[in-house]
Amino acid sequence: MIKKYSKEVTSCQISNSKKLKSLIFLGYLPPVNTLRKIGSTLKEEISFPAELLYCNKSKLAQLGCIVDKEILFPYTYPYTSSTTKILRDNFADLYKDTIKKIDIKKNDLIIDIGSNDGNLLSNFKNNHKVLGVTPEKIGKLAIKRGIPTIINYFNDLTVKKILKKYGKAKIITATNVFAH
């Protein structure tokens, strides 16, 4: 059952070296943010091995199991990044740091991959052209807040659509896309 929804990492995702060292194994963990309704019957949850592997050749630490994106970030994903004050503050700081370091013009495109409810892009939207990409229906909240959002996974087809409709981005952000 696990193999249906995941893929074991047998070689480094950067160098292709098969010499991977296990740093820590935390057991089997279910995907986070799969909330059940209060009072509902507890059912067995699918779990995946949580092992951190290290490749000496590339120096990359990586998870030993790649879980299907539709399991980790389903359309019904319940979490909204705007809920957490510290995250709102961190994203505001990221915006301030970015505009100090990079000369961004009004028409430069900023894309956030895994944009969720548009929390990060809300900092950029008044002075810059923004676009969110997120697979969850929560992206509709961003659209209501005036943040153009593509509700889909970030993949080759999505990239082609973005390039055709919006052009190339000056800045691409991706936060909480390595959540598991």
Segments predicted by a language model, with ranges:
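N-terminal juxtadomain amphipathic helix
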Residues: 1-85
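Sparse, context-dependent recognition of short Cys/His-centered cofactor- or disulfide-binding micro-motifs
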Residues: 5-8, 38-40, 89, 95, ...
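Surface-exposed beta-strand edges and their flanking turn/coil or helix-capping segments
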Residues: 35-39, 76-78, 88, 135-136, ...
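Fe-S ferredoxin-like electron-transfer domains
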Residues: 50-55, 59-127
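Conserved SAM-binding loop
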Residues: 96-180
